[in-house]
């Protein structure tokens, strides 16, 4: 009889209803996240895949030699910085408002870019700090790459200038879009962390890869006109 009860209990736990299913289905926010939470991730993968297509088309060509090394750097730095800013704005809204209601000073969905970067407001200060980190951070990564893979690094000051400019453009666009998207998602009573960060990191990959491609192309064109080799010479052995 004990064996029968044990078997019956086992069958119930294997085939019976999950005790967590009922409460989760009844919880509206959880049900909403289950239903729509995957959409930003899937769409972000689609957006990011376009950057992968660009890389796939260019990485095997001589003028883009070394691009595969720089792509994870520019995409990773931009994605991480915009994720920090998105979480910062989201936390600010959680402190000062309720989902679905924007503070009076954030009612405008498309703010002036100057208000995003040039005011004394706390989110604007945060955006400036992150923007100021771009050039020093990329210079450090650039130097490390040069030490490790020097023969694949374009030996041109012009490339360094364009690379840093592309990084600034990428992060500037992403930080502004973070401000816009957080306001839009908050107005729709959605969690900005879950719905904005995937989109913005996907856009960061696409922007970073596209701008990096332009950097290599411009560097190759300028050095071709000057009749110079576009890459540094391999270090001679002992």
Regions flagged by a language model, labelled:
Residues 109, 206-226, 236-238:
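Marks the mature luminal ectodomains of secretory-pathway proteins
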Residues 44-113:
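Transmembrane helical segments that form the transport core of multi-pass membrane transport proteins
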Residues 2-15, 32-44, 63-76, 117-134, ...:
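Transmembrane alpha-helices of multi-pass eukaryotic membrane proteins
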Residues 1, 83-146:
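Helix-loop-helix junctions within the multi-pass membrane cores of secondary transporters/permeases
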Residues 1-11, 22-35, 50-70, 140-161, ...:
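Membrane-lumen (extracellular) interface motif
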């Amino acid at each position: 009889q004990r064996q029968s009860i044990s078997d019956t209990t086992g069958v119930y736990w294997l085939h019976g209803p999950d005790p967590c299913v009922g409460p989760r289905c009844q919880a509206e926010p959880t049900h909403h996240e289950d239903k729509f939470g995957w959409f930003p991730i899937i769409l972000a993968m689609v957006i990011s895949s376009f950057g992968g297509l660009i890389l796939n088309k260019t990485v095997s060509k001589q003028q883009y030699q070394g691009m595969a090394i720089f792509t994870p750097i520019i995409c990773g730095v931009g994605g991480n910085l915009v994720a920090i800013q998105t979480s910062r704005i989201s936390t600010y809204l959680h402190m000062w408002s309720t989902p679905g209601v924007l503070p009076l000073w954030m009612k405008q969905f498309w703010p002036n870019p100057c208000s995003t970067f040039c005011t004394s407001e706390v989110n604007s200060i945060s955006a400036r700090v992150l923007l100021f980190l771009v050039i020093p951070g990329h210079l450090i990564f650039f130097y490390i790459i040069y030490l490790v893979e020097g023969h694949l690094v374009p030996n041109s000051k012009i490339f360094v200038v364009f690379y840093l400019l592309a990084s600034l453009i990428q992060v500037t666009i992403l930080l502004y879009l973070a401000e816009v998207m957080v306001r839009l998602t908050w107005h729709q009573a959605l969690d900005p962390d879950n719905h904005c960060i995937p989109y913005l990191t996907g856009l960061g990959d696409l922007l970073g890869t596209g701008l990096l491609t332009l950097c290599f192309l411009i560097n190759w064109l300028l050095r071709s006109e000057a009749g110079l080799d576009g890459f540094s010479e391999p270090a001679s052995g002992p």
